Amino acid sequence: LKKLHLYRDVQRTGKWCDLGQVRSAWNSTVLVLGLGDIGGEFAKRAKALGARVIGVRRTGTDKPDFVDELIHTDKLDEYLPQADCVAITLPGTTATKGMFDAERMAKMKDGAILLNVGRGMIVDTDALCAALENGKLAGAGVDVTDPEPLPADHPLWKMENAVITPHISGGYHLQETHDRICLLYTSPSPRDRTRSR
């Protein structure tokens, strides 16, 4: 949204350079696929930044307070053209494998941003590259890819409008996560093992 990755690239050249307009979460529409721990936390933050948040679930009808609207996955294609940002936080299953292929990306809003912190198998990486290259998508942020690890010569690495992290965006790199894991293994009491949040 703020082009920070591009400004980092320009910084290396030593140039003071304005890269033009940026986008804001305010008044945008964010579609969050999967409302588990990761999706729920992402949705809360998007809403706090002023976005209209649409949650997508396979099951369940109880709408959490942190989403403005809750839909089932069978209505996904109807809502894709509205979304400025699509955040995928789904697990990798036979039902989600290849869910975001070229056909589905074509249904997305022109200039949308695609985020994938779920599993790489959900997004067709070659279709993603094509959508980024032809301008269908304004950008992508992926913490997971297919294949994973992404080969060094894969074209996604060279996409200026993509940010790639090597499956590290989860909480496993936080000290508090390590502390909780240690507590699980060292505590004699099951009650102490859950005393982390």
Predicted region positions:
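Phosphate-binding beta-alpha-beta segment of Rossmann-like dinucleotide-binding domains, i.e.
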Residues: L1-T29, E41
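Glycine-rich Rossmann-fold phosphate-binding loop(s) that bind the pyrophosphate
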Residues: L35-G36
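Aromatic pocket-lining residues of Rossmann-like dinucleotide-binding sites
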Residues: A46
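NAD(P)-binding Rossmann-fold cofactor-contacting core
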Residues: L49-D65
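Rossmann-like adenosine-cofactor binding region
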Residues: G60-P155
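Adenosine-phosphate binding glycine-rich loop
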Residues: E160-R180
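Conserved small/polar residues in nucleotide/adenosyl-binding loops
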Residues: Y185-T194
